[in-house]
Amino acid sequence: MAGKVKWVTDIEKSVLINNFEKRGWVQVTENEDWNFYWMSVQTIRNVFSVEAGYRLSDDQIVNHFPNHYELTRKDLMVKNIKRYRKELEKEGSPLAEKDENGKYLYLDFVPVTYMLPADYNLFVEEFRKSPSSTWIMKPCGKAQGKGIFLINKLSQIKKWSRDSKTSSFVSQSNKEAYVISLYINNPLLIGGRKFDLRLYVLVSTYRPLRCYMYKLGFCRFCTVKYTPSTSELDNMFVHLTNVAIQKHGEDYNHIHGGKWTVSNLRLYLESTRGKEVTSKLFDEIHWIIVQSLKAVAPVMNNDKHCFECYGYDIIIDDKLKPWLIEVNASPSLTSSTANDRILKYNLINDTLNIAVPNGEIPDCKWNKSPPKEVLGNYEILYDEELAQGDGADRELRSRQGQSLGPRAGRSRDSGRAVLTTWK
């Protein structure tokens, strides 16, 4: 009989530990021989640092890629997507097609974004083109809505820059980088409230790219009705959907936690907008997720000991266009409601079934192609090997989320095009 998997974690969450114990795995310390380490992003940095000089053996796997930040840091994600667009343009790919105003027809899925302080002059130029716009500033390396604020005047950003420079604890050399993005001020509202989507995406390998979408994502709602009014720019209960912020609101509901399941959203949209339009929206969401992964795949350290479950944040505007806002390397495993706890327990269970075949001691040399029976609530979102195989187009087109891309005779209202191939 094979030995038991030895596990370590530095994240004390019951949804993790219960899953390990259910499998009969054995807990050890990080200084002992371990097979599976569910670690924080800080720890992964140390494990793969040159100074650590640590080499993982074939029977060890971890839950982050070494340079996951190429996707999960807001500034690097945007940089990689911009590079990806340029490369496709250079290749003459139809995906990089632009309209008469120079806007990408298909790859325009991230709001206009600049890095600060590096791109300050470029930002000012853009700001002056549409001075009535609202922009959202976010620190590159923080999560849960920390350090975010909205601006609609250049004087506000000048004040921020001045305050940052004169701050006694922030030197100019290591001043925290921010991104500033055009704020989506026409979000789709339900019950007058803004919401976003949190979707879970598992990547088992980047080269070839193989990723899975979790079917049980959810919507996070603001507790206060949305208004684009400048008087409410500082009210984060109106603008930010993060549970870490909304749970402090007077109207926060501790029973449902201000959340809807994705399937409820789908039913709502089918009844209010129609089935075809709703299917097109979800196809497009799936498509932009795959494009974001393709954008970072060339620069990602595709270490065979790694897999990663990302939390994708998507906002839908009132024209039913989805926007990729950010990607989280460590989506929260804290449970805000009973349903939340069940969802996250099942998410970890299904993730482990794919990452650790049969719950046996890992062998990082396996082909990372689990049988369909173990996918649970995951479904294959994209499989590069399959996409490049003979007859793959027909196979892929028959799957949910695999049908976006250029086509003849599109119109702006009929949806932003349907792809005939994923190659």
Swiss-Prot record:
Residues that bind L-glutamate, according to the entry? Answer: 220, 259, 344
Q: In which tissues is it expressed?
A: Expressed in a wide range of tissues. Has a stronger expression in heart, brain and testis.
Query: One biological-process term from Gene Ontology?
Result: microtubule cytoskeleton organization
Is the keyword Magnesium in the record?
Answer: yes
Q: What class of enzyme is it?
A: ligase
Main location (coarse class): cytoplasm
Question: What are the TTL domain coordinates in residue numbering?
Answer: 1-367
Q: Give the residues the record marks as binding ATP.
A: 138, 144-145, 181-184, 194-196, 241-242
Listed under catalytic activity are: (L-glutamyl)(n)-gamma-L-glutamyl-L-glutamyl-[protein] + L-glutamate + ATP = (L-glutamyl)(n+1)-gamma-L-glutamyl-L-glutamyl-[protein] + ADP + phosphate + H(+)
Q: Where is this region: Disordered?
A: 391-423
The similarity annotation says:
Belongs to the tubulin polyglutamylase family.
Any idea what this protein is called? Polyglutamylase complex subunit TTLL1
Lineage of this protein's species? Eukaryota, Metazoa, Chordata, Craniata, Vertebrata
